[in-house]
Amino acid sequence: MKGPRGSRSGRNGSPRRLVIVESPTKARKLSGYLGSAYIVESSRGHIRDLPRTAADVPAKFKSEPWARLGVNVDADFEPLYIITPEKKSTVTELKGLLQGVDELYLATDGDREGEAIAWHLMQTLKPRVPVKRMVFHEITEHAILAAAAHPRELDIDLVDAQETRRILDRLYGYEVSPVLWKKVAPKLSAGRVQSVATRIIVQRERDRMAFCSAVYWDIVAKLDASVSDPTAQPLTFVARLTAVDGLRVATGRDFGAMGTLRGDCEVSKIIVLDDLTATTLAAGLRGAQLTVASAEEKLYTRRPYPPFMTSTLQQEAGRKLRFSAERTMSIAQRLYENGYITYMRTDSTTLSESAINAARTQARQLYGEEYVSDSPRQYTRKVKNAQEAHEAIRPAGETFATPDAVCNELDGDEFRIYELVWRRTVASQMADARGTTLSLRIEGRAGEQHVVFSASGRTLTFPGFLKAYVETVDELAGGEADDAERRLPHLTSGQLLDVIDLTPDGHATNPPARYTEASLVKALEELGIGRPSTYSSIIKTVQDRGYVQKKGSALVPSWVAFAVTGLLEQHFGRLVDYDFTAAMEDELDEIANGNEQRTNWLNNFYFGGNHGVSDSIARSGGLKKLVGVNIEGIDAREVNSIKLFDDEHGRPVYVRVGKTGPYLERLLAGDDGELTPQRANLNGTLTPDELTLEVAEELFATPHEGRVLGVDPETGHEIVAKDGRYGPYVTEVLPKHDDDYGAADQGTKKTKKGRRASASQGPKPRTGSLLRSMDLQTITLEDALKLLLLPRVVGVDPASGEEITAQNGRYGPYLKRGKDSRPLTTEDQMFIITLDEALKIYAEPKRAGRQSTSPPPLRELGTDPTSGKPMLIKDGRFGPYVTDGETNASLRKGDDVVSITDERAAELLADRRARGPVKRPAKKARKVPAKKAARLAPARGISQSPR
């Protein structure tokens, strides 16, 4: 830990003050504003927490029945707090600093977490000097000096709210997660919000899987207005067929998820066109003239968007910048701590009077008086927890720095987020955008049939706030930007139009779009689940747990997520019920507002009581009883079986979630009538909605034994290519009399007692992993035989007498002589390198560590937008990772070396940069002499302080 910032004594005998914040960056900034009378140091986040593992539980509590929870559920839910191992030196240092000051200022963030950090600091440091709570929502000199001059008391209601959530999440996770370990797979987790978020994503995938597409047609007409008005602008435009003989032509909105017309449609007034009908109508209209039946023009206005709050910033950064929620919040945190924007965790869209004035002044200077709204705009919304209702996210200060003014001070990501916040804030005080819409109804005849075409246009007459900011639409969900224009000629009723071209246009309805991070945040917010400050961590958690992976920007659930969600829905329905979870959030907010007693609430939730609605967890006997009663009734095979559909013979097809991954299964009747399972491995890149009956049949038809390539002419053994647990490989099939001791693709066999016998007891088939340049579907017998020759003997070193071999390893091709390995530059070298060439390589001095020759990259990508350097995918000690030569970022679950995009690689690098350098084990702190502290009243909770 670095030395404190500031002097240990004030000027002219003024009080010496210690200010504690969460981060070193924040400490540096505050130290510059507060001056030498203040010592500013950081706690680096929370210093205490519940035990993470059983090993963290102090010895005297290990025998307690509640020890595994870290919460004494029998004593008013007292939490067992321990100082986390990595923070012990920090606590020692802070205690030493506290001995030389007259006042302690706790300047952590003003939300639940910040208030809790401040409370834990008080309980751990046990200060004997006056303690003041210093709160600010932006890090500017004016805000910091004002906060120091007007401190407040610690808000215990807010501390209670944080502690209750922490205890609740611990009880939920530690009681429900073991059910998943026993019934689904080890290392899974359940959570109050993460399980509901997973259910939302799974349900959307279910909807996609059940979706039946409907096909419908219409006609697009290209029309010429010059026959009536040679000066019309534009002269040509397009219109779409909307009615035939008084019947409205069906559009995608008229069809339901099953591919039929929706129940609320008046079927007698709708016509569904097919290819033939549309083509016939188009043929009948060729060369005809159409008439404008009506032209309706209307004025419209569009109001600016409110300034950002946490959730809308995450959504817009996701849509506009393609940033993940985690990446957005990490960047916003840096901007806040360095004094560029206000606090980034807020539910409020309100601006202070000075911020409104700053935005209006800047809009006036940059765009002109006419672009500023006539009066100040204030955006108010109902905030669940008034005590956490900070100002909206905006540029810091009483005057805003323009993006141009700070572009040289910020990195690329920081600049993009700052510009986004600045534009949104300034635009919020600008004038409405104004424009006109024009709707044309055009009629004609196709033989005996009366047809109606429609065209709609939009023209922006005054951009207003759109000069500064245009909100981005979610591409997966469709939509149109606010500044998009569609110009039509100004026509009047009765004018004639020539038909230039007619195109029958076929359409198919699309399944509901998968959630992106942005749309998931919006859904969680609309449902009232979680709070904006937690959304980024929730989305990260469901990906880290393997429940969800990204495909482009879409969130795709895994089959494990299906199994877990199904189990929770069937046996713990209230825990993943949207309304119940939202109601629980409101109740927790009531604790923060001082309207609910936390101990009583937790007691009802865990042990049961008369709290909540008729079927609440409390009235059902509480969480503990719910888990205890239900766990024995859970059929593991049932919850791990996801029925997809019936095949053509009425046989159910299931996805089974097994210990080594998901697989397909159905039962087939043998000649004797006995049912035997037919199974097929699932490709990890196949998404659930892509697993159709046709695809399933193809997988079932793929031989489990692999693709036969041919016969080795030397041994007569059959050579097959397989896809194994550790990737694709080739192997030889030994004759039955040679294969008494093990399966070719296992190398071991099970004994009667279930133990695996060594493959060395019998012949072992030759195997070889495919090279990176090879594909399982196209590899030839010739390629396979070359692989089976590896490791290839190159020759014998005449000097040492040691054999030199060429081999293929995890890190690429290499030479091996005894214990001395040297990398090869290409895979082809393994098959063609000569002894002389190998000896030349060994004659060169061996370079160790980072100076050694690196294996070739797994894949080359484009340029990183932040560093401007090329990105490579490499294979490292802990698996594949992306690098630009400066920053390394491991690929996460769901990221595939072959399919990863430049955009995703850049996102991983940006996330890694945002987390800062890798933390090395801290050096042992020097001992700081401290006076013996007076015995204080015991802290709430079971606290374990360092000796």
Curated annotation (Swiss-Prot):
Statement: the UniProt record of this protein carries the keyword Metal-binding: yes
Any Pfam family matching the protein: Topoisom_bac
GO molecular function: DNA binding; DNA topoisomerase type I (single strand cut, ATP-independent) activity; metal ion binding
Classification via InterPro entries: Topo_IA (IPR000380), Topo_IA_2 (IPR003601), Topo_IA_AS (IPR023406), Topo_IA_cen (IPR013497), Topo_IA_cen_sub1 (IPR013824), Topo_IA_cen_sub2 (IPR013825), Topo_IA_cen_sub3 (IPR013826), Topo_IA_core_domain (IPR023405)
Boundaries of every Topo IA-type catalytic domain copy: 155-614
Keywords: DNA-binding, Isomerase, Magnesium, Metal-binding, Topoisomerase
Gene Ontology process terms (BP): DNA topological change
Residues reported to bind Mg(2+): E22, D109
Region annotation (Disordered) ranges: 733-771, 846-888, 910-947
Spans annotated as Interaction with DNA: 189-194
Reaction equations catalysed: ATP-independent breakage of single-stranded DNA, followed by passage and rejoining
Record: active site: Y343 (o-(5'-phospho-dna)-tyrosine intermediate)
Annotated site location: Interaction with DNA: H46, R165, R166, D169, Y174, W181, R345, R545
Enzyme class label: isomerase
Residue span, Toprim domain: 16-140
EC number: 5.6.2.1
Needed co-factor(s): Mg(2+)
SUPFAM superfamilies: Prokaryotic type I DNA topoisomerase
Biased composition (Basic residues): 915-934
NCBIfam families to which the protein is assigned, alphabetical: topA_bact
Oligomeric form and interacting partners: Monomer.
Family assignment from sequence similarity: Belongs to the type IA topoisomerase family.
Role played: Releases the supercoiling and torsional tension of DNA, which is introduced during the DNA replication and transcription, by transiently cleaving and rejoining one strand of the DNA duplex. Introduces a single-strand break via transesterification at a target site in duplex DNA. The scissile phosphodiester is attacked by the catalytic tyrosine of the enzyme, resulting in the formation of a DNA-(5'-phosphotyrosyl)-enzyme intermediate and the expulsion of a 3'-OH DNA strand. The free DNA strand then undergoes passage around the unbroken strand, thus removing DNA supercoils.
Protein name: DNA topoisomerase 1
Highest classification ranks of the organism: Bacteria, Bacillati, Actinomycetota, Actinomycetes, Mycobacteriales
Gene behind the chain: topA
